Amino acid sequence: MEEALKTSHRAIRSFVLRQGRITAAQTRAVAEYLPARQIDAHAEWRDPWNNQRPLMLEIGFGNGEHLAAIAAQRPTWGCIGIEVHTPGVGSLLLQLVEAGTDNVRIVHDDAVTWLKTLPDAILRCIIIQFPDPWPKKRQQKRRLIQPDFAAVLCRLLQPGGELQLATDWADYAGQMLTVLNATPGLQNADADNGYVFRPDNRILTRFERRGQRLGHAVYDLCYRRIP
């Protein structure tokens, strides 16, 4: 996913754009199926479902496994996914076509820049799973969850809407808690302002199951938008 985090001097990206290997099937899927399912990040916002559905957003959907599953579980919702890496977009499209799922739209562009252009309080749920942890100390300014970005996420949520996050890096989880607990308008779903159990709607992906086999702990966070 492509994020630009502003500092006082210049924009700092929270990603490195590595396209990686893309299969022939993914390439065809992007060419054939993306145009009908794409949201133009450079155009004025228009709700793809004409304000008739609650909207869920997943930022950085990776290979699309989680987004495809949750969209199938919530057929009456409008599900939007943001991902900068083309192989992941192709992978998601293949899953959607195979399942016949038609309630997903895709932003294949810079997430932070696009989110800043959206009107207030349009989203019922925002999901961010396993963002790049940037583990080295000199890299941590690239982490996605920073105060300015947290304020944007809060602004986009409807009152009562949820922000759900997960990471398997303890240090990053602690930073998320610090930043989000201090964000006006967000209330931690945990009474002690700590971590929560995995939400029922969060599907275990192959990535997470592999981490569990390796003994990686996963930290879940959940926040609600308050007036």
Curated annotation (Swiss-Prot):
Here the disulfide bonds are none
**Which catalysed reactions does the entry list for this protein?**
guanosine(46) in tRNA + S-adenosyl-L-methionine = N(7)-methylguanosine(46) in tRNA + S-adenosyl-L-homocysteine
- Could you name the active-site residues? D132
User: What Gene Ontology cellular component terms go with this record?
Assistant: tRNA methyltransferase complex
Q: Where does S-adenosyl-L-methionine bind?
A: E58, E83, D110, D132
For this protein, the record's InterPro entries field holds: SAM-dependent_MTases_sf, tRNA_(Gua-N-7)_MeTrfase_Trmb, tRNA_methyltr_TrmB_bact
Q: Which Pfam families match?
A: Methyltransf_4 (PF02390)
The GO molecular function terms of this record are: tRNA (guanine(46)-N7)-methyltransferase activity
What is its EC class? Answer: transferase
Pathway connected to this protein: tRNA modification; N(7)-methylguanine-tRNA biosynthesis
Presence of keyword Iron-sulfur: no
Assigned EC number = 2.1.1.33
Instruction: Kindly indicate whether the keyword Iron belongs to this entry.
Output: no
Where substrate binds, per the record, is at: K136, D168, T205, R206, F207, E208
Keywords, A to Z?
Methyltransferase, S-adenosyl-L-methionine, Transferase, tRNA processing
Outline what the protein does: Catalyzes the formation of N(7)-methylguanine at position 46 (m7G46) in tRNA.
Q: Which HAMAP family match?
A: tRNA_methyltr_TrmB
The UniProt family comment states: Belongs to the class I-like SAM-binding methyltransferase superfamily. TrmB family.
- The name on file for this protein is tRNA (guanine-N(7)-)-methyltransferase
Origin species: Acidithiobacillus ferrooxidans (strain ATCC 23270 / DSM 14882 / CIP 104768 / NCIMB 8455)
